[in-house]
């Protein structure tokens, strides 16, 4: 198997120029680096909305597309909140924004200083995504923004603690139970 990597750094970040467009037509994946994500210390600083791959992953593509849709909508809500503020955002939109932030923090970022979180085997990646997908697709009995923020921060921390456990161990299972009990306690219906 041969893997070839190439880089293109268009002047001013203009991806419409001919060399960049020609390169994008022949590659199987694109990792768009983001100054904004790097400045926010979100590593790896690969922009999750601009980046793409033609290769089959370990996670069901329909679920990936649904998660990507949540991420896009969360980004739109974030841009809207920069203009009108958090106060002008409905609780429903704020929950969707928090879901996107959760997806970004617990699945798209990693802690390279943690020997367990630095690399993830495909089975664990698929398993964790399925749990995260369940979190993302549920409706929650939350209405106050302070409560929404606190809830998603707590869920985020439980995910990050889960990332520090070895896959398949009793500690891994115990942390997963703690996480699922937490988010299911606020599920409606």
Predicted regions and their residues:
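C-terminal non-catalytic accessory extensions
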Residues: 167-189
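P-loop NTPase catalytic core
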Residues: 1-160, 168-176
